[in-house]
Structure formats: structure tokens, C-alpha cells
Amino acid sequence: NIAIIDQARNGTGCAIVHSDDEVGIQHLNQEAAKAMAAGNRAGYDISKAHAMRWITSNPAKAAGILNQTGSIEVGKDADVVLWTGDPFSVYSRAEKVLIDGALAFDMKDPKIQPITDFDLGIIQPQTNRVN
């Protein structure tokens, strides 16, 4: 469905990969990969760069804040994830995460690896089990 919405209005649709689920929100890149693969199988020519917009600039556009965030440009707010490999692969891991320009996670530095429910496993994702 994402690829179909993406191709609406002569390819100017504003497709978004989203999740209301506490687990799914942590895997939007993989959901985008599945949608890209399904779209390509259906005959749409969807590049990885184009599919990346489904989880970056398109949500910002839909929220009316594309002038503030959604892409890496001078003057825009951005949180950035550097991956160990292809961000659409289930085998890639977040190597570094920058939030508001500050290093928030570094897989090679144990001092910058916050404990999260993602690391602990999801039992009841609605509750805070870290503290």
C-alpha cells in the first residue's frame, strides 16, 4: 500500500511508514524496506534513497514541519543514525546516534550506550521497566 500511495498523483504522493506500536516504531527502516521490496515486485521502480523519504522527509511534510526537519540541511533540526551497513537490512545495527547534534549512542563506547527496553526485551512495552 505504501508504494501505491507513493505513486499517487503522478508520483508525487506523500507515503509514510509509521507505527503506533512500541516495538514497530523501533523498526521503521525495516518496514520501509519491506514496502520498497513489495513495490518493486509490483513493478514500481523505488530506490533506497526514495524509500528513505518515507521515514524522514515525508512525515515532516505531512506534519507541516518540512522547513524545520525531515532532511539534513543547514538550519534544520536533525537526529542522525549511522548504520554498520545498509539501513534497510535486518543485519545492520545502529553504530552511532546523534540527537540535536550530541552523540547519544556509540556502539563502541560503553559509556554512551543507554539502557533501553529494546535492549532488555519487550514484555510490557507500555511500562517503564528500566528504573
What are these regions (language model features)?
Residues 40-44, 105-109, 121-124:
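Glycine-rich loops and low-complexity Gly/Arg-rich segments
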Residues 21-22, 115-121, 126:
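Metal-coordinating catalytic core of metallo-dependent amide/deamination hydrolases
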Residues 1-83, 103:
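His/Asp/Glu-enriched, well-ordered alpha-helical/loop segment
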Residues 1, 112-113, 130-131:
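Extracytoplasmic and endomembrane cell-envelope/extracellular-matrix remodeling and assembly machinery
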Residues 61, 73-118:
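C-terminal cap of metal-dependent C-N hydrolases
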Residues 87, 99, 122-131:
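C-terminal recognition in membrane/secretory proteostasis and scaffolding
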